[in-house]
Amino acid sequence: MVLPFKHEPFTDFTVKENRKDYQDALAKVKEELGKDYPLVINGEKIYTDDKLISINPSNKNEVVGNVSKATKQHIEEAFTSAKEAFKEWKSWSAEDRARVLYRAAAIVRRRKHEFSAWLSYDAGKPWDQADGDTAEGIDFLEYYARHMVELEKGKPLADRPNEDNKYFYQPLGPGVVIPPWNFAFAIVCGTTVAPIVAGNPVLLKPSENTPVIAYKLVEVLEEAGLPKGVLNFVPGDPAEIGDYLVDHKDTHFINFTGSRATGVRIFERATKIQDGQTHLKRIVAEMGGKDTIIVDESADLDLAAESIVHSAFGFSGQKCSACSRAVIHESVYDEVIEKSVELAKTLTVGNPTEDNVYMASVVNQKQFDKIKDYIEVGKQEGELVFGGETDDNKGFFVHPTIFKDLDPKARIMQEEIFGPVVAFSKAKSFDELLDIANNTEYGLTGAVISNNRENLNRAQTEFLVGNLYFNRGCTAAIVGYQPFGGFKMSGTDSKAGGPDYLQHFLNAKVVTERF
């Protein structure tokens, strides 16, 4: 009997034994750094001379792994493999497919600290952030497995005399998964196993920044009994194979999480019908945000500061849900900023393999340079009240940074930075708080800190984001509890980790029989 879904608990690192276990996992992973990793096509491991070099962003002289790069010919072979695997995989019952995911979840759970340690090296995640990433991956495995078993039952329809109607789901066919680097296990896992448990083979092209941890997921699913050809691992340079994967006539869906620019490019290209294509491609896209926490005059100001600081600076602001803007009622504006600065001063910045580090590096030199440039923009547009320091001598470190007195239309109030930078702006009324909150092209997450029920009720419908939180931060959605996805240019509102997600990878079919 399968128990009801319940999210994976987070590790309490105040417990000495847990700290020791994580340190042991870090030591184990460190011994494995620098290895070569293959492509995986139809179960065959293929090593190439041309490789992605994955480095530790907190120690850029440390190579995490060398991952083989796929060519267009490899992509063709992977599609051939996926189409052949589809013939059998689609006929597996949902329960049998779900068992693969249950076994995979059990494998990861037994080795939880090991996977988290890989995230500390491959993605620069501090202990708690890495632990949460791994736990979320387990949640996706458990949640989607259960949900597919329910979906296989179909949906009830009305019947007429002498007529029977059935409504059920069938998989689409081979598709492409293009996940991000910031949740290098959780989102890679969720975006991959959702279409797989729905019956679709997948070509997985991981981020070039974090391909090693993605390969570890491939190993787990293979160990869990996933048939060859159902998951084909094809890392590579986006400029060389990205468009080719999206354009391919045999691509039935693209499951993408990443930047607005790449998401829009995928949308534009995927709508074009290629020679030999016999279907319309499904597009699932989560494309980032410019997320706002608003604070009215009735709010608990300590809670407001805590919500802003932890939402802005957790994992160095490298979350699409991160608080990048704080819009505060003018009567409490100065006090909220003062409390936020004092709290930010307590945050530790350092190597993520060390205990009690709150923030580590950002992911690479390009992102470091981008954030550094935005800090200079912020100095021109507002007043720097805390932070702004950067250091890329050993790793790509950016300290928590707070600006105040921004015009709501300023660049750092409108453009996604994806780093530890938060900008404060003031408003005279709740109407203006909402107007500013809604004045970007994004609509992913937001939060309202208020003790005014009327204001909270208004925000529920008028704050135009896919995930809205009251009296807490705007990050840390949990699978099955807060399905995740946004409005406007934040994406297709696919609600990952929710009851509607798997239908993106299924066709609904109706069969009517007359007696």
Curated annotation (Swiss-Prot):
GO terms for cellular component: cytoplasmic side of plasma membrane. Its EC number is 1.2.1.88. GO terms for biological process: glutamate biosynthetic process; proline catabolic process to glutamate. The active site is at residues 286, 320. SUPFAM superfamilies: ALDH-like (SSF53720). GO terms for molecular function: 1-pyrroline-5-carboxylate dehydrogenase activity. InterPro entries: Ald_DH/histidinol_DH (IPR016161), Ald_DH_C (IPR016163), Ald_DH_CS_CYS (IPR016160), Ald_DH_CS_GLU (IPR029510), Ald_DH_N (IPR016162), Aldehyde_DH_dom (IPR015590), Proline_metab_enzyme (IPR050485), RocA (IPR005932). Pathway: Amino-acid degradation; L-proline degradation into L-glutamate; L-glutamate from L-proline: step 2/2. It comes from the Bacteria. Disulfide bonds: none annotated. It catalyses: L-glutamate 5-semialdehyde + NAD(+) + H2O = L-glutamate + NADH + 2 H(+). Keywords: NAD, Oxidoreductase. Belongs to the aldehyde dehydrogenase family. RocA subfamily. HAMAP family: RocA. This is 1-pyrroline-5-carboxylate dehydrogenase.
